[in-house]
From Swiss-Prot:
Entry function: Mitochondrial intermembrane chaperone that participates in the import and insertion of multi-pass transmembrane proteins into the mitochondrial inner membrane. Also required for the transfer of beta-barrel precursors from the TOM complex to the sorting and assembly machinery (SAM complex) of the outer membrane. Acts as a chaperone-like protein that protects the hydrophobic precursors from aggregation and guide them through the mitochondrial intermembrane space. Compared to TIM9, it may function as a substrate sensor.
One GO cellular component term noted in the UniProt record for this chain: mitochondrial inner membrane
Record's keyword annotation contains Chaperone: yes
PANTHER family found in the cross-reference section: MITOCHONDRIAL IMPORT INNER MEMBRANE TRANSLOCASE SUBUNIT TIM10
Name of the protein this chain belongs to: Mitochondrial import inner membrane translocase subunit TIM10
Localization terms from the record: Mitochondrion inner membrane; Mitochondrion intermembrane space
Disulfide bonds: C40-C65, C44-C61
Residue span of region Required for heterohexamerization: 73-93
Length: 93
């Protein structure tokens, strides 16, 4: 790779950049988890509950909600990657 950053592959990240990237990824994962918990809780858990444990309906609802959330997240991620690749191939940034 040249000193101007052209040619030969991707530039190497410094340790600080790797730490920042890991922190950003952790923030994204934490945010996604919190949204998943909030959305599925609102959808599946009755606000006037009287039991300490989840009942069968709540448990099934939460299971389906989490599965749909992850499936949707994967589909959106794949579509975003395809869009990014097509923009890069067309020379748009």
């Amino acid at each position: 790779m040249s000193f101007l950053g052209f040619g030969g592959g991707q530039p190497q990240l410094s340790s600080q950049q790797k730490i920042q990237a890991a922190e950003a990824e952790l923030d994204l994962v934490t945010d996604m988890f919190n949204k998943l918990v909030n959305n599925c809780y609102k959808k599946c858990i009755n606000t006037s509950y009287s039991e300490g444990e989840l009942n069968k309906n709540e448990s099934s609802c939460l299971d389906r909600c989490v599965a749909k959330y992850f499936e949707t997240n994967v589909q959106v991620g794949e579509n975003m990657q395809k869009m990014g690749q097509s923009f890069n191939a067309a020379g748009k940034f």
